[in-house]
Amino acid sequence: MTDTHPGVDFMIKPEATSASKIDTAEWPLLLKNFDKLLVRTGHYTPIPCGNNPLKRPIAEYVSSGVINLDKPANPSSHEVVAWVKKILRVEKTGHSGTLDPKVTGCLIICNDRATRLVKSQQSAGKEYVCVLRLHDSVEGERNVASAIETLTGALFQRPPLISAVKRQLRIRSIYESKLIEFDNERNLAVFWASCEAGTYMRTLCVHLGLLLGVGGHMQELRRVRSGCLSENDDIVTMHDVLDAQWIYDNTRDESYLRRVIRPLESLLVGYKRIVVKDSAVNAICYGAKLMIPGLLRYEAGIEVNEEIVLITTKGEAIAVGIAQMSTVELSTCDHGVVAKVKRCIMERDVYPRRWGLGPQSMKKKTLKKEGKLDKYGRPNENTPADWSKSYIDYSDPNAEVAKPAPVVAPAAPTVEAEVNGVEDSKKRKSVESSEKDEDEAAKKEEKRRKKEAKKEKKEKKEKKEKKEKKKKSE
């Protein structure tokens, strides 16, 4: 990927309406075919922060990378992950789903920041190639093929006898399966299966043996796909990882290490994308919802409550989010929440803070200073009527535009004065009572501290006396 276009700066530029010099179908990772995304606006101010995923500094590249590892037979998944952690000298590592010690194949290992995506990878679908040993000969290959195809859809499974989890009946889905090869003389069958995460292939082999009426068990197993990465997507061995780190340590050549490790964005290629303005990136990293003004481009076919990925103009993944608007709404609305964050991926303060600089935010700050809003920005008795009518708090799910107050006939000035006087006296009383409560609480706290200090002094004296008595007795 890195050698495809060495001189090209992979970035969505402002007002990029004309076609790019190179075909965007060849652009890497999350920027692939970005010109086919629907455009909300082409105007934004680029901020010289962050890097394209393929051009990150090597330390950052390793700590936000994933490895598509070909797990060797015999060591457990946890041992392999611990070895990778030790070789690369990273703080954290995680994997995409446990493989039994004797099983080989795809094991996606996530480093440091990429471990935030481990949960989504563990729940992703898997594909296996399995060798089934039958306990007796079967009449024909067709019977085996039909039995394998019969065991598709939702199946009841109980974990095998040798398992680390409770042997509880569970339902798992087999999406597709097909026979690859059958040897009747040796009673061996090789088949491929695409299944849900958490499916026990060992149990499936036992069920196939029962279905054929001869019994059977799993002879050998290999995982050929985990989530969006398969064994054809630059799979590497433990020796490759060790050699790449050795070459970098001794020759400072990082090219081999960059080929072994791939950016975390490669795990998010299957998600629908929403491109965010640079000025809105850090707010999302702090947990804010993405609003319409921060939106640049979006994918067609987004549905409400669908999982999407929020990306920067340089193709970096900011967060995995949940869409709050469909594609149709995004094209027509001029305000509202686009998506809320499910799992933040980017570190905070990679991009500068840009929130609180708009006209509405500045007005809100001045009202807070003048005491016309409370410290949380909520209206109080001093809040101007025009502010409460016009301002909508999107953090409040029940927030609506305030309706204008009904017109009331002006009352006599004497009555108004009396009402104001009563309200003022009530306010004074409430303030005085709260001050008294605070004073009483402070006095109680002082008394408690004095008592504790006296107790400590007594205990110290008693200890000293005991020590002196012991010395005298000796």
From Swiss-Prot:
7 X 3 AA approximate tandem repeats of K-K-E: annotated segments: 434-468
Enzyme Commission number: 5.4.99.-
UniProt GO MF annotations: box H/ACA snoRNA binding; pseudouridine synthase activity; rRNA binding; snRNA pseudouridine synthase activity
Sequence repeat spans: 443-445, 450-452, 454-456, 457-459, 460-462, 463-465, 466-468
Domain of life: Eukaryota
Compartmental location: Nucleus, Nucleolus
Active site: D100 (nucleophile)
Residues in PUA domain copies: 271-346
GO biological process: box H/ACA sno(s)RNA 3'-end processing; mRNA pseudouridine synthesis; rRNA pseudouridine synthesis; snRNA pseudouridine synthesis
Gene: cbf5
Feature: compositional bias, Basic and acidic residues: 368-378, 423-434
Cited InterPro entries: Dyskerin-like, PsdUridine_synth_cat_dom_sf, PsdUridine_synth_N, PUA, PUA-like_sf, PUA_sf, tRNA_PsdUridine_synth_B_fam, TruB_C
Keywords, sorted A to Z: Isomerase, Nucleus, Repeat, Ribonucleoprotein, Ribosome biogenesis, RNA-binding, rRNA processing
Primary localisation category: nucleus
Composition bias type Basic residues, residue spans: 446-474
Function field: Catalytic subunit of H/ACA small nucleolar ribonucleoprotein (H/ACA snoRNP) complex, which catalyzes pseudouridylation of rRNA. This involves the isomerization of uridine such that the ribose is subsequently attached to C5, instead of the normal N1. Pseudouridine ('psi') residues may serve to stabilize the conformation of rRNAs and play a central role in ribosomal RNA processing. The H/ACA snoRNP complex also mediates pseudouridylation of other types of RNAs. Catalyzes pseudouridylation at position 93 in U2 snRNA.
Xref: SUPFAM superfamilies: Pseudouridine synthase, PUA domain-like
Biased composition (Low complexity): 406-419
Description of how the protein assembles with itself and partners: Component of the small nucleolar ribonucleoprotein particles containing H/ACA-type snoRNAs (H/ACA snoRNPs).
Annotated segments matching region Disordered: 361-391, 406-474
Similarity comment text for this entry: Belongs to the pseudouridine synthase TruB family.
Any single GO CC term annotated in Swiss-Prot or TrEMBL for this entry: cytosol
NCBIfam families cross-referenced by the UniProt entry: CBF5, PRK04270.1, unchar_dom_2
Protein name according to UniProt: H/ACA ribonucleoprotein complex subunit cbf5
PROSITE patterns linked to this entry: PUA
Annotated catalysed reactions: uridine in 5S rRNA = pseudouridine in 5S rRNA; uridine in snRNA = pseudouridine in snRNA; a uridine in mRNA = a pseudouridine in mRNA
